[in-house]
Amino acid sequence: MERIKELRNLMSQSRTREILTKTTVDHMAIIKKYTSGRQEKNPSLRMKWMMAMKYPITADKRITEMVPERNEQGQTLWSKMSDAGSDRVMVSPLAVTWWNRNGPVTSTVHYPKVYKTYFDKVERLKHGTFGPVHFRNQVKIRRRVDINPGHADLSAKEAQDVIMEVVFPNEVGARILTSESQLPITKEKKEELQDCKISPLMVAYMLERELVRKTRFLPVAGGTSSVYIEVLHLTQGTCWEQMYTPGGEVRNDDIDQSLIIAARNIVRRAAVSADPLASLLEMCHSTQIGGTRMVDILRQNPTEEQAVDICKAAMGLRISSSFSFGGFTFKRTSGSSIKREEEVLTGNLQTLKIRVHEGYEEFTMVGKRATATLRKATRRLVQLIVSGRDEQSIAEAIIVAMVFSQEDCMIKAVRGDLNFVNRANQRLNPMHQLLRHFQKDAKVLFQNWGIEHIDNVMGMVGVLPDMTPSTEMSMRGIRVSKMGVDEYSSTERVVVSIDRFLRVRDQRGNVLLSPEEVSETHGTEKLTITYSSSMMWEINGPESVLVNTYQWIIRNWETVKIQWSQSPTMLYNKMEFEPFQSLVPKAIRGQYSGFVRTLFQQMRDVLGTFDTTQIIKLLPFAAAPPKQSRMQFSSLTVNVRGSGMRILVRGNSPVFNYNKTTKRLTILGKDAGTLIEDPDESTSGVESAVLRGFLILGKEDRRYGPALSINELSNLAKGEKANVLIGQGDVVLVMKRKRDSSILTDSQTATKRIQMAIN
């Protein structure tokens, strides 16, 4: 009432009415800015102004029953005045303090589960070690980094489906949880969050942090794995760095690291096989990393590394459009070129055929320890600005750029012949020949490059052929800068093609990647990598090859047995026996093979000489191309444990030991599995019992297809005929009986009939 009187009073003064009705508000824009929309225009000011009031908060009326009017110090916690425009009460910030100290405690069981990423971070920081602070110039370059430790690698869409299913299971909308990773996560989270009282929106936010990789393009001068990025603000400034060792590892970093190691091993191994692309795919599909299929990780994981990208390209996935040369990632930032074949002469008068890029182009080069910008014309380096951690890294970048420029003085600096080969003993292409040559020794290259006087430019310094810095002179076109070059920020992916030699090209035919670009660095993987492919058996040395070969035969014994009797040549050519050949002394491989194959042929021909253990033991030796000779062997040598060890043709040895009573096979003392000999093998009897219900018709008849094993017979329909393999490696034709009544007589007649059929 009082207020209204006051306003009336004001309005009665003629000047007030005139101002309010006649004058133009010339700053309508300003008024609009501060009065339209619900978005707060100056939040910090608003906050300060609000908090300066006595009761800046509104709360539900129930608060008056739950919080006392005054605290222990006698300060008022809430006002008896109602909030204008709602039926809430005005509350002091002190009430919040009181509530936090004295309010009711609900169950906290869900907090560590919902806020898992925060709890984990606290643990990592608690156990982390912060070292001394060093003051020095920081060469930071922007890289795309993972800012969210401890996440799974779901796509945004997959994560959205999981979150909806966990947090809002009753919402309408079709959600199909299909991927390997979605199902276990959904199940686990539903169980963890039963009866959770935390607001669903908060739970959804936190789940997103756990499920999706979040990347940012940040300036970094050190470690780039997510456990380093989360403390970036503590470990590097503009002119200082603080040493830090994380207090724990997270699975996403471990996966990234192990993926790179697995991919490198696989590409290196595939490159030396007969069909690299097929081998690579076979290995990617049969490898697991930390229990997850490698192909699933490749589909979800955005890691960009040469070997990983080759594997992705082989699977038909898109990869980054930048290309790799000499371990540096090149991204063209401007210009264009056309390719032309040209023959050039090295300083040793060797002719090289190189594909010359004609035209002016600019590139960024980003390596692990150095970065650069390169401007080049046709076979001419115009300018190279390098920055790096140390002299060595800077030199590496300069060599790569000089070779990439294809300048004549570089080609003329070659001393001696270029004959570098890759792991498969094939000659490298000319550009990689040159690169390898100068990576070994770049002295002549730097001496012959040429020197120029330089102007004094801030932040830039010259570099002499012996890699010492100078402010007066520098190698032609080359400068060292304090500033790093940012990594290519785009996450754009392009469609690529790959040939059988694992060369990856973009749609215009430019080679982006090849096995030569895969790093030779060997690390130890954080997660267990399980290579099921026989091609990777040798990665853990000769013993692993030996054990794996025999385990493979035992696991596949049923099929191996049939092939042994039906199509031995196919069996001998199986790729699973390839690694074993490296254990057999080269000079005698052929003789061993000829001997074993002859022995096996006798077993096939002479009834009752079939011997499971002996076949398994000698089979890998039959895989080498055989040499016919009259030589007989009582033992065969394999190179393991740094020396030749003997496998006895008849009987046990430390290498191959079969215990008839326990049925266990041990290879070099390691258990290789259970080996079930065929029944009555020793007594050359017949598996008559197993043939009950079948009538033996006579010798094998090829029209009825390949021989079945005894186990497969059960699938025959009554009256159906089939060839069957019996214990001794002999094949007979049988028919499944139409009536069950005569089964008893089968086993008696079977014995006679088999003898007749075979003889």
From Swiss-Prot:
Keywords: Cap snatching, Eukaryotic host gene expression shutoff by virus, Eukaryotic host transcription shutoff by virus, Host gene expression shutoff by virus, Host mitochondrion, Host nucleus, Host-virus interaction, Inhibition of host innate immune response by virus, Inhibition of host MAVS by virus, Inhibition of host RLR pathway by virus, Inhibition of host RNA polymerase II by virus, mRNA capping, mRNA processing, Viral immunoevasion, Viral transcription, Virion. Belongs to the influenza viruses PB2 family. One of its GO terms (cellular component) is host cell nucleus. Pfam families: Flu_PB2_1st, Flu_PB2_2nd, Flu_PB2_3rd, Flu_PB2_4th, Flu_PB2_5th, Flu_PB2_6th, Flu_PB2_7th. The keyword GTP-binding does not apply. The gene is PB2. It comes from Influenza A virus (strain A/Swine/Colorado/1/1977 H3N2). Plays an essential role in transcription initiation and cap-stealing mechanism, in which cellular capped pre-mRNAs are used to generate primers for viral transcription. Recognizes and binds the 7-methylguanosine-containing cap of the target pre-RNA which is subsequently cleaved after 10-13 nucleotides by the viral protein PA. Plays a role in the initiation of the viral genome replication and modulates the activity of the ribonucleoprotein (RNP) complex. The lineage of its organism: Viruses, Riboviria, Orthornavirae, Negarnaviricota, Polyploviricotina. The record marks 627 as: Mammalian adaptation. One of its GO terms (biological process) is viral RNA genome replication. SUPFAM superfamilies: PB2 C-terminal domain-like. Influenza RNA polymerase is composed of three subunits: PB1, PB2 and PA. Interacts (via N-terminus) with PB1 (via C-terminus). Interacts with nucleoprotein NP (via N-terminus). Interacts (via N-terminus) with host MAVS (via N-terminus); this interaction inhibits host innate immune response. The keyword ATP-binding does not apply. One of its GO terms (molecular function) is RNA-directed RNA polymerase activity. A motif (Nuclear localization signal) lies at residues 736-739. This is Polymerase basic protein 2. It is found in: Virion; Host nucleus; Host mitochondrion.
